[in-house]
Design a protein with these regions (language model features):
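HDAC/HDAC-like amidohydrolase catalytic core signature
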Residues: 1-309
Length: 309
C-alpha cells in the first residue's frame, strides 16, 4: 500500500503578518519537496468538508463561536498575542482539521496504509476554550476524538515530538483514559507546561522534558521511554503531532536533532507499533521554523512512513 499526503492550497490564505515565524512559506517548502518523491509511493488528497459538529467533542461551543466571529473582513486580528487570523484563515483552519479527518478515513478504508497531513495553522497548543501559540483548533485532538466517536476505538496514542509541549492536547485529554498523550519537549520553555509530574487522571499522560542543548543521542535515548509506554498502552491507532523544531537549525528552540534523527525515531515507533495497531498511523504537521530543516525533516519522516508500507 501507499502513503497518503493530505494538503490544501487554502493554507496560503492564512496570513499571519510580516515577520511571523508561522508563515505561508513553511508548508510551501514542505509540499515543493514532496513533489520530488516518486508519485507511485504517495496518494495526494485534498481535505474533504466535514460536519462542524465534530469540533464539539474537542472544543467548547462558546470557543467555536468565538473563533468563527474572529475572522476579519480585511487585515489581521489576534486571538492571543501571537495567534493571528486573516480573512483567509477561516478556510485554512477548516482544511487543517479536515485533513486529519480525510487521512483517518483513508487509512480506515484502506485507500493508503498511513498518511501525513501538511497543514497550517498547527494545533497542539489550542486548548478546549483557548487559542494559543499559533494554534486555533487542535487538529490532532479532533482526529483522536473522531477515531473514538466514528470508528469506536478505545485506545488512541498521540506522540508529540514538537520541541514545545502540546499543552492543548494534554488539556483536552488529561481525564480521558482512551487517549495516551506522550510529549518530548524542551523544558523549561514555552508554553511552561509539560513537567514529568503531569501524568493525567489515568496515568495517560507521559511528559519527557529535555534541557536546552540536549543532543540527538540524549534525545533518542530518552525516546526509548516513549516506546516503553507505547508497549504498555497497546494503542489501536497512532497519531503523530509532528513538529520539527527540535532540529539543531531551528531558530525557536535549542535542541540538537538532525533531519536523519526524525527518520530514525519515526521508523523505530512504527516498528514498535506494528504489532499493536497494524500500522494504523496518521501524522500531522505542527511546528518547524527553519525552512531547509523543515523540508529535510518532513521528507525523512515521510520516507519512514513510505518504507513501512
Amino acid at each position: 500500500m501507499k502513503t497518503g499526503l493530505v494538503t490544501s492550497d487554502t493554507y496560503q490564505n492564512h496570513n499571519t503578518g510580516e515577520g511571523h515565524p508561522e508563515k505561508i512559506d513553511r508548508v510551501t517548502a514542505v509540499i515543493d519537496n514532496f513533489k520530488k518523491i516518486d508519485n507511485k509511493k504517495l496518494v495526494w488528497k485534498k481535505p474533504a468538508k466535514f460536519d462542524q459538529s465534530l469540533l464539539i467533542n474537542t472544543h467548547s461551543s462558546k470557543y467555536i463561536d468565538l473563533v468563527n466571529k474572529s475572522f476579519p473582513e480585511n487585515g489581521l486580528a489576534f486571538l492571543d498575542g501571537d495567534t493571528v487570523v486573516s480573512p483567509g484563515s477561516k478556510e485554512a483552519t477548516k482544511d487543517a482539521v479536515g485533513s486529519i479527518i480525510t487521512a483517518i478515513d483513508g487509512v480506515q478504508q484502506k485507500e493508503f496504509k498511513n498518511a501525513f497531513c501538511a497543514v497550517r495553522p498547527p494545533g497542539h497548543h489550542a486548548e478546549k476554550d483557548k487559542a494559543m501559540g499559533f494554534c486555533i483548533y487542535n487538529n490532532v485532538a479532533v482526529g483522536a476524538n473522531y477515531l473514538i466517536e466514528k470508528y469506536k476505538y478505545n485506545k488512541i496514542a498521540i506522540i508529540d515530538f514538537d520541541v514545545h509541549h502540546g499543552n492543548g492536547t494534554q488539556d483536552i485529554f488529561y481525564n480521558n483514559e482512551k487517549v495516551l498523550y506522550i510529549s518530548t519537549h524542551q523544558y523549561p520553555y514555552y508554553p511552561g507546561s509539560g513537567s514529568d509530574k503531569e501524568t493525567g487522571k489515568f496515568n495517560n499522560i507521559l511528559n519527557i522534558p529535555l534541557e536546552a542543548g540536549t543532543t540527538a543521542e540524549q534525545f533518542l535515548n530518552a525516546y526509548e521511554n516513549v516506546l516503553k509506554k507505547l508497549k504498555e498502552f497497546k494503542p489501536e491507532f497512532l497519531l503523530f503531532s509532528a513538529g520539527f523544531d527540535a532540529h539543531i537549525d531551528d531558530p525557536l528552540a535549542q535542541l540538537r536533532l538532525s533531519s536523519e534523527d526524525f527518520y530514525h525515531l519515526t521508523k523505530r515507533t512504527l516498528e514498535v507499533s506494528k504489532s499493536m495497531c497494524n500500522g494504523n498511523v496518521v501524522s500531522i504537521l505542527e511546528g518547524g521554523y527553519d525552512l531547509r530543516a523543515l523540508q529535510d525533516s518532513t521528507k525523512r519522516h515521510v520516507d519512514a512512513l513510505i518504507e513501512f508500507n
